[in-house]
């Protein structure tokens, strides 16, 4: 989406991810309140539109969230967004779109989810419950397992290589107070954890979590009015829908991620080698390897070398998932994309303490896919490019 005027992040908020005993509306409220307080907002009616992403819980999630803040009523349009794992990021996209087009000067995007209190089966992640692939057991873990075995066949990668992704991301999460799983784990421990779908062992699969995140966005004029001291600019944002494939294709690629990232680079004027921080959709270890290549961080087939050479960790070309990624942070479906953005904002502001990426990161990118459409293709993909300063 071409931004018609400059848009900035005013404030962000998030809850700790994991298992919660309070419902999605309470979690969403906590994150939204944090984001608004961090934006120096002294009156709730300053927010002119609200978008709330949710994957599995309620048809009026947004109204439930803002009801408890006394913000429901005729002067605040609250729009609910459903797009599976991409829902939270898409809610932020919609808020950005409002500000970019001049519809509002200050908007909020929220993602919230509680799976502990609202259990769902893996079939719920399909674009259609009657989809023949899902009916025959082709759920997400199985699809990523097939991609992993093909990648191993083509590149010579081993299950131990895949396990290195979990080891890296768990190490990144060590000092992150919001992460669910943290602390050192070895390649052997990852490989020897329970097999789910070869070669995906349990520790190579993200944990489905509860949690929420929120992002307040506004115009440049509004940022100055609010006295935002550490501005973060939205350099670009792209939402894509996946193509339908009815023929054989390369399952080690990801058409929707390639298309979305190419458009984002063009829109923002920023190339993959200029990105300092990347939060990507590492729902499974193999996903991170494939996305290195799909987003142009390295050449096709060089993802494993990129990992082994330390290019995706501190001191490398681009720190991938410094918060710990979905593999360590947990994955509350509708909230994950918004949390990626919130964490990138904190990194660009230098607020991440023990897991801060260097003293002066300037560019941060986030990527999240949502649902399944056909074969290994995703139904949706949302990407944001953020830069430090005005």
UniProtKB/Swiss-Prot annotation:
Which controlled-vocabulary keywords does the entry list?
Acyltransferase, Aromatic hydrocarbons catabolism, Transferase
Broad EC category: transferase
Q: What is its EC number?
A: 2.3.1.310
Instruction: State where CoA binds.
Output: 19, 121-122, 194, 205-206
InterPro entries, alphabetically?
Answer: Thiolase, Thiolase-like, Thiolase_C_2, Thiolase_N
Q: Name one GO biological process term.
A: catabolic process
Per the record, what are the reactions this protein catalyses?
Answer: (S)-2-benzoylsuccinyl-CoA + CoA = benzoyl-CoA + succinyl-CoA
Q: Which residues form the active site?
A: 85
Which PANTHER family did the record assign?
A: ACETYL-COA C-ACETYLTRANSFERASE, NON-SPECIFIC LIPID-TRANSFER PROTEIN-LIKE 2
- What the record says about its domains? Binding of CoA to the BbsB subunit induces conformational changes of BbsA and BbsB, which may directly affect the turnover process of BbsAB.
Q: Say which family it is in.
A: Belongs to the thiolase-like superfamily. Thiolase family.
Record's protein name: Benzoylsuccinyl-CoA thiolase subunit BbsB
| Protein purpose | Component of the BbsAB thiolase complex, which catalyzes the thiolytic cleavage of (S)-2-benzoylsuccinyl-CoA to succinyl-CoA and benzoyl-CoA, the final step of anaerobic toluene metabolism.
| Gene Ontology MF terms | acyltransferase activity, transferring groups other than amino-acyl groups
What gene codes for this chain? bbsB
Pathway where it operates: Xenobiotic degradation; toluene degradation
